[in-house]
Design a protein with these regions (language model features):
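Short, glycine-/aromatic-enriched active-site segment of Class I SAM-dependent methyltransferases
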Residues: 154-171
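S4-like RNA-binding module at protein N-termini
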Residues: 1-50
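Conserved S-adenosyl-L-methionine
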Residues: 55, 70-78
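Glycine-rich SAM-binding Motif I of class I
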Residues: 65-66, 87
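A short glycine-rich, Lys/Arg-flanked "PGG" loop and its adjoining helix->strand segment in the class I
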Residues: 132-149
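S-adenosyl-L-methionine
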Residues: 78-133
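Conserved class I S-adenosyl-L-methionine
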Residues: 52-63
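Flexible, glycine-/basic-rich loop-and-beta segments that form/coincide
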Residues: 208, 213-236
C-alpha cells in the first residue's frame, strides 16, 4: 500500500486525509498463511538448507500454518501439524492431502506413536516455553538423519530480569546466550549445530529471533559464530 506515493507498512502511519491511496498487487508475494512463512523461508535461504523436497516433515506449534506453507511449497512429501490449540490451521492447508492435523496436543508431551511417521525435517515455532523443555520430545520423534530447525525466541529463554519493556530482549549478549543455551541443550542430546541464522523478520513485539539447524551427530556449537550471527541480526 502506498499513501501519497510513499510505502505505508504500519497501521499507525500518520497520513494526510487528502493523500492518494494505492494498493498494489505484488505478483511475487507468495501469500503465506502467516507472517511466520517469511521467517522460515528466509532462514532456509540464509542457511542454505536443509533440503525439503520429498521429505516427511513435522511442524511443531503449527498455529495458522506459515511454516507448513513454506514446507509444502518447497516440495515436502507430507507435513504433520501439531498444536496445543484447535482449529487454527489455515483452511487451504488443512484441506491439503499432504497435511495431517493433530490439534489439542502439547508438543512437550508428544510421543513418537502420536505421529503417522518419523519426521525427516522438524520445524518448531513455540511460545511461552523454553525450547530446552521441548527438545527431548522433538528428537525422540525424529527419523534417522533428520534435520531440526527450531526458532529460538530469546524472551522465552532468558530470565525475567533480561526482558525489557514490551517483552523485548534488547541486549545482544542476552540474545546470543539464549541461542547458545539451546544449541548446548541440543548437543547434550546428541544433536550438533550445522548452522544458525537470524530470522529476516522480528517477532510481533520486535524481538529478534533466530533459527538453529540441528542434526544428530553434527559438530559442537561454535559460541563465537553464534555471537557473530546474533550481532549481525541486532545490527539489522
Amino acid at each position: 500500500m502506498r499513501v501519497g506515493g510513499q510505502l505505508a507498512s504500519k497501521p499507525a502511519t500518520m497520513v494526510d486525509d487528502a493523500a492518494a491511496v494505492l494498493v498494489e498487487d505484488d505478483a511475487d508475494d507468495p501469500g503465506y498463511a502467516s507472517r511466520g512463512g517469511w521467517k522460515l523461508d528466509g532462514a532456509l535461504d540464509r542457511l542454505g538448507g536443509p533440503e525439503i523436497e520429498g521429505r516427511l516433515c513435522l511442524d511443531a506449534g503449527a498455529s495458522t500454518g506459515g511454516f507448513t506453507d513454506v514446507l509444502l511449497r518447497r516440495g515436502a512429501r507430507a507435513v504433520t501439524c501439531v498444536d496445543v490449540g484447535y482449529g487454527l490451521l489455515d483452511w487451504r492447508l488443512r484441506t491439503d492431502d499432504r497435511v495431517t492435523v493433530i490439534d489439542r496436543t502439547n508438543v512437550r508431551l508428544m510421543q513418537p506413536t502420536d505421529l503417522p511417521y518419523a519426521p525427516e525435517v522438524i520445524v518448531a515455532d513455540l511460545s511461552f516455553i523454553s525450547l530446552r523443555l521441548v527438545l527431548p520430545a522433538l528428537v525422540a520423534c525424529a527419523a534417522e538423519g533428520a534435520d531440526l530447525l527450531p526458532m529460538v525466541k530469546p524472551q522465552f529463554e532468558v530470565g525475567k530480569e533480561a526482558v525489557g519493556a514490551g517483552g523485548v530482549v534488547r541486549d545482544p549478549e542476552q540474545r546470543a546466550e539464549a541461542v547458545r543455551r539451546i544449541a548446548a541443550a541440543a548437543y547434550d542430546l546428541g544433536w550438533g549445530t550445522r548452522g544458525v541464522a537470524a530470522s529476516p523478520l522480528p517477532g510481533p513485539s520486535g524481538n529478534v529471533e533466530f533459527f538453529l539447524w540441528l542434526r544428530r551427530g553434527a559438530g559442537a556449537p561454535d559460541p563465537v559464530r553464534i555471537g557473530q550471527v546474533v550481532e549481525a541480526g541486532h545490527d539489522g
